[in-house]
C-alpha cells in the first residue's frame, strides 16, 4: 500500500473521479441509445467507436484540468500506440484508463460495458474506479496507506458495501465468463475446475462487479493468440483486492503493469477470495496437462 502522490489529497481526487465518471456515463448512455451514430472503426486489435473516443477525451482533459501539477502520467487504451512503452518505464505514478471496456458488448447492445480508471504506483494499482453506466454503479477501491476499502455508490452518492457470496466449495461456486473471448483450452480448464455453474457477462469490469455483488465468485482469463491489456485489468483488480478478494496469476503471483506490450498474459484468476488458493492450485495443475509449458 502507498500514499497518494505529493500534493494530491484524497477527497478532492475522489470528487473529481466521481464527476468525470458520471459525465462518462452520460456520454456512453447517449451513444448506446443511438447506435447508428457509433461510427465503428474495426481496424487494429478491436473495434473503436465514437463513444470510446469521446470518453477518452473527457477523461484525459478532465484529469489534466483538475490536477495540472500532479506528478503522474496518463495512459489510455486509445493513446497507448502513440505513447509507447516508455510511459510505463519513465513514470513512478501512472493513470491507466479504459474509456470503454467491453466495446463489442456495447456495440451488440447487451448493456454490459464499463469505464476503468486505475492509479498505478511503481507498476501496482493503488486506486481503482469501475463505472457501470447501465446499472448506475460506481465502484471504488483504495489500496492506500491511510485507507484500504471498497464500495459502490449510485449517482446520488448513496453507498453500498461489497457483498461477497458465502459460497466456498468449488462445486458451489458461480463462474462469470465472457461471451466474446472463449476457446477450447479455456473450456477444458473450466471443466477441470469443476465449478458449479456459470453466468455470461461482458466486460472485465462487469464481471468483477458481479463478484463484488455476490452474483458470481470467480472469473478466469486465459491468454491465447491475444491477451487482455493493462487497461482491462488494473481498475477491476484494485477494486477487488481492496474489497478483500483475490486477483492473481494461477501460480499466485500478482499482476504487474510493466510489460512494454501492455499485455496481461497467462492464466489470471479473480475471485471472492474464500477459495482463491485452491482455485489457483487446481488451475495450475490443469494447465500443466492442457497446455504443457504454458506460463500461468
List the predicted regions and their residue ranges:
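Acidic active-site catalytic centers that drive phospho-/nucleotidyl reactions
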Residues: 52, 77, 98-101, 105, ...
